[in-house]
Amino acid sequence: MVFVTGDLHGNFERFKPKYFPEQARMTKQDIMICAGDFGGVWFGDSRDDETLDWLEHLPFTLAFVCGNHENYDALERYSVAEWHGGKVHRVRPHVLHLMRGQIFELESYRFFTMGGAKSHDIEDGILEPDAPDFERRLTMLQRKPRARYRVNHISWWAQELPSDEEYAEARRNLDAVGWAVDYIITHCAPTSIALMGSRHNEADRLTDFLQEVRERAKYHYWLFGHYHDNKAIDEKHILLWEQIVRVI
């Protein structure tokens, strides 16, 4: 079995048996995929351990693509392994980060993964903790109602968007299968879908790349998160947030 859910942001209540009773029939061979903003690797130190150990003891394997709210510095410290034909960061034996541009074969179906998204909750800026005016600017923003800001390498990471190498690897892997997959799992949506939503959404290099994938690839379903809603955009494109759906 393969299930997919949306943004978690470090809140894993939905995986408790009373909310997800299907897990009673699952084993570690079954997979739950989070479509980004996993948030379980946030502090990058022992403060994450209790949560990650709890996730490891769930009856299924938990895998996630990255979102725009992840501690990329911490994720990149985990060793890279091969899993079902693609690269992962092995956070725990059964808690896995599905790296960008990969194709995984799960129960004889191909899954293409391309995590990441551009943050839109940074209208008040990204603060540099080493800047001489950091404390002053932080205090001012903390006093401002509904301030939307982030702190570099503490609550925001430039790696939220893919690197040139990750785009190149995605193209190589798609070329190898003739751009034919069964499922696509991303955090943000292709440009044409992203612009249908909030006025805060805008095109960027990643959404434009995903638009190219939408136009070139052959696939059955595309599942994504990021926009905090549960909604079928059309018969092929599914936006997920709290909902858990079985795809295989």
Residue spans for each PLM region:
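Active-site-proximal beta-strand elements of phosphoester/diester hydrolases
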Residues: 1-9, 108-117, 185-187, 239-242
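Short loop/helix-cap segments at secondary-structure boundaries that form the rim of catalytic
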Residues: 104-106, 230-237
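Active-site-proximal loop/helix segment associated with metal-binding centers of metalloenzymes
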Residues: 93, 109-200
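Catalytic metal-binding/acid-base residues of hydrolase active sites
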Residues: 8-9, 38-39, 68-71, 117-118, ...
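Core catalytic region of metal-dependent phosphoesterases/phosphodiesterases
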Residues: 5, 10-106, 199, 203-211, ...
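Structural motif
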Residues: 4, 31-35, 183-187, 223
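Acidic, histidine-bearing metal-coordination/catalytic regions of metal-dependent phosphoesterases
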Residues: 1-4, 8-14, 131-134, 147
